[in-house]
Amino acid sequence: MYDYGTFTFESKAEVLDKAKTFWNPDKTQFWTDTGVDLVIDRREGYFLWDMGGRRLIDLHLNGGTYNLGHRNPEVMQAITEGMEHFDVGNHHFPSVARTALAQRLVETAPASITKVAYGSGGGEAIDIALKSARHATKRRKIVSIVKAYHGHTGLAVATGDDRFAKFFLADQPDEFLQVPFNDIEAMERVLAPGDVAGVIMETIPATYGFPLPAPGYLEAVKAITEKHGTLYIADEVQTGLMRTGELWCITKHGIEPDILVTGKGLSGGMYPITAALLSDRAAKWLDEDGFGHISTFGGAELGCVAALKTLEISTRPEVRSMVHYIADIFDQGLQRIQADHPDWFVGIRQNGVVIGLEFDHPEGAKFVMRELYENGVWAIFSTLDPRVLQFKPGLLLSRELCEDVLDRLAVAVARAETVVRGRKAS
């Protein structure tokens, strides 16, 4: 019997069966068929325990939600203490928690940012960003990159790959245009007519497998947006909050975006909260009609408490130093592993602890993912480029755990290569 206080289950098998009945049959079956029949029970730091008792090192982190680890003690303490004063709050009125977080976000953001609008999920924050761009420019078209992913809400999903954008028959698809990543000429062509409200890009596109921007590419895109009166929207949901060794990855490029979107890790992994950080131009609607976007749970006060503590931890000098230290360990270790498998392990895409590992097979990352799972590590393939494994170490990993992960990865890469080469031979 598994007793969780307000509910119980007899077994893992019962959970899987009822998940297919009452929750999501296709996704549950997909993971079972893939060999990852994971039902998370206990979780602590950078470890997960399956209901069967097996421990996994978490290198997925739910897209960076658990940058600081699962159930981070400092974040939990902040929320516990916050519950003495706060709850969700009332979204209509000024709030000490929302105001304190908004001020801190503006203080830590690029100089262009002056206001904050809150959401409860990343897609909602993206929707706020796109609506803000449309209001500011009085234009409707939005440009994103091919293989983009910015969430699953109404406007956000329309910016993404057709797999998701067309699934629910997205409205007015002609208003959402896509160009290849790192193709500056294509970006110039699509913006030249002067009818685009905003360009939205992840600074390093996560679901596309973390391809790195070519030198000067993002800077050139920003210059083109300024030339044509288009807003530049930096989606930092997965690349922000110190994952690249800077609080916001976009600042490494010297870019001051018109809008910056943050989420996932902002929650400390404990209470949902996201935000669209707006420049004066993008925030005009807040002066004209502050009821233009209403979100009951956007900027929930307990979420603000969690986010403030998360920002405080993430901006500590020792955490910044730790990220660079961890990145160096993995840089050296990954190169050693790649040298042993040069025809199989063909690419390392790394900026800080934002890492993608590329393999020589159309779905190579799925094979490595499965072998890693069997060897006690959870990392996920890139949905829109399954050649690439998303490999996302936490910000506070110990050297010992880094080396443990590298040892397990070396075994998994070798085993996956044997499986794939064996299939090709047969």
Regions found by a protein language model. Name each.
Residues M1-S426:
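Conserved N-terminal phosphate-binding loop of PLP-dependent enzymes in the Aspartate aminotransferase
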